[in-house]
A protein has these predicted regions:
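Charged alpha-helical initiation segments
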Residues: 1-27, 155, 174-178
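Short, hydrophobic, well-ordered secondary-structure elements
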Residues: 24-47
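Charged/polar positions within long, soluble alpha-helices
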Residues: 42-46, 96-107, 152-159
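Short acidic alpha-helical/loop segments enriched in Asp/Glu that coordinate divalent cations
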Residues: 43-61, 108-111
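Helix-adjacent hinge/juxtasegments
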Residues: 52-84
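Histidine-centered, metal-coordinating catalytic motifs and their short helical/loop contexts
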Residues: 83-111
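An amphipathic alpha-helical core segment
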Residues: 104, 108-131
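A hydrophobic membrane-anchoring alpha-helix module
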Residues: 134-178
């Protein structure tokens, strides 16, 4: 199952970012893999729950449309006003900002004192894009924890058991470097 591999890498990257000094690259990787894992899991559930050819639906539908279709057919509710499903949109907005990144001109008014600016070791903070401001330890934790909760909820609501991370086929782990 692709989602198992993606989730394993997501968990690895999140752990590395949480424990390491150089958090940024690991958080970026884990936050992107939250989106990839969630969408792969939605595709997995659609194929298991609804036999037939769903490839057109998978390719043409957004992750939110896939989630809505699953909830409609299986009869469960995802409250997008509360966590964890409140985070769903943020995960995919972040993913889209990166996947569809464009060069932009950023301008910002700075209140950085001129005397500090003139010191060689002091520079004003650079303006950041939306995705760069989202790339924080707090958001990496929220994306990871809420994605894990969403996967567990969807797994249970699909009638497969209580914990997709404890099932035999989901115990796959990967060691070493990417």
């Amino acid at each position: 199952n692709p989602w198992v591999l993606l989730w394993s890498r997501c968990a690895w990257a999140y752990k590395q970012g949480s424990e390491g000094i150089e958090q940024g690259p690991y958080h970026l990787f884990s936050m992107l893999l939250c989106a990839f894992s969630l969408e792969a899991f939605l595709n997995h559930l659609i194929r298991i729950n609804f036999p037939g050819n769903w490839e057109d639906f998978e390719r043409k539908s957004s992750p939110e449309e896939k989630l809505d279709k699953l909830s409609e057919i299986l009869g469960f509710n995802t409250d997008k006003g509360k966590r964890p499903f409140q985070t769903f949109k943020h995960v995919f907005d972040f993913r889209n900002d990166i996947v569809h990144a464009k060069t932009v001109k950023l301008e910002e008014t700075s209140t950085f004192p001129i005397d500090k600016f003139l010191q060689a070791d002091e520079l004003p903070p650079l303006p950041l894009t939306k995705w760069e401001t989202t790339l924080t330890t707090k958001n990496a934790t929220r994306f990871f924890e809420d994605s894990q909760k969403m996967i567990a909820f969807l797994y249970k609501e699909s009638g497969f058991g209580d914990d997709p991370f404890e099932e035999v086929y989901s115990r796959t782990t990967f060691e070493g470097n990417l």
